[in-house]
């Protein structure tokens, strides 16, 4: 996954400077200089700075982390967790939408259906996957996959990472709102367990369309909201530069959403975010997903469906 060079966010400048100093000293050490002790001291300082920084992230900073280009994406989780993955394409009505990846495979030996939004990691793949913003055919593909999973009694895993559904004219003409609604309804009608994991951005109805699940898990520095901070800023203040203020007011972090009962569990990220150790993050996600499915296993179809429906009905009632 990801490119060879680490990309730093603006607020990570102190860590970037320390890492740069470490690289310089390692170059000197390679030429014969005995400075290993000094390198170790700076490495310890950099690790502490990183830990302190990420322990006090603001909602806006978490939004930046959630969007980090080197953060593991849907296809990385599929590659790391799903054996024998067989992707399926098309909605059988219009065409295929690669913003939404879906198919069947084995998760720790058990057959499973996987659907998720893929943003892409290079210019070519970002364009091909439309930056993770699905069109109507993407959500109709998700419905097709969920109906197949239900028919064959297979649990469904959703990997959520989207800024939102694609708002283009063509998408609207093909029934974007209806497709999102039907995908959300398909989640609710499943008689098999479904687990959703928000791995980056959970943007509005585009995320909810595949995240209406029995268990909703969320990474520590992911965000989940009805609208992006930039869009909220433009609407509320008529000023797109107030995104930071909007993010602070919107309660979009995993920590806030757990308090509100919108999500069920927060998954700890490696020090400095998932992008600094994708393999460890994917392993942690695998354990949490397995535990969630184990908790739901053996429950009857009617019970699974009723509990899921009640879970989402209770969110508004508990916040009222």
Curated annotation (Swiss-Prot):
Pfam (any one): ACCA
Any single biological process term in GO: malonyl-CoA biosynthetic process
Keyword list, A-Z: ATP-binding, Cytoplasm, Fatty acid biosynthesis, Fatty acid metabolism, Lipid biosynthesis, Lipid metabolism, Nucleotide-binding, Transferase
The protein's enzyme class: transferase
Residues of the CoA carboxyltransferase C-terminal domain: 41-295
Annotated signal sequence range: none
EC number(s) from the headed UniProt entry: 2.1.3.15
Catalysed reaction equations from the record: N(6)-carboxybiotinyl-L-lysyl-[protein] + acetyl-CoA = N(6)-biotinyl-L-lysyl-[protein] + malonyl-CoA
Keyword Cell inner membrane: no
Main location as per UniProt: cytoplasm
Pathway(s) it belongs to: Lipid metabolism; malonyl-CoA biosynthesis; malonyl-CoA from acetyl-CoA: step 1/1
GO terms under cellular component: acetyl-CoA carboxylase complex
Subcellular location(s) of the protein: Cytoplasm
GO molecular function, one term: ATP binding
Protein origin, superkingdom: Bacteria
Function: Component of the acetyl coenzyme A carboxylase (ACC) complex. First, biotin carboxylase catalyzes the carboxylation of biotin on its carrier protein (BCCP) and then the CO(2) group is transferred by the carboxyltransferase to acetyl-CoA to form malonyl-CoA.
Protein family per UniProt: Belongs to the AccA family.
Oligomeric form and interacting partners: Acetyl-CoA carboxylase is a heterohexamer composed of biotin carboxyl carrier protein (AccB), biotin carboxylase (AccC) and two subunits each of ACCase subunit alpha (AccA) and ACCase subunit beta (AccD).
Name assigned to this protein: Acetyl-coenzyme A carboxylase carboxyl transferase subunit alpha
Record lineage: Bacteria, Pseudomonadati, Pseudomonadota, Alphaproteobacteria, Hyphomicrobiales
Gene behind the chain: accA
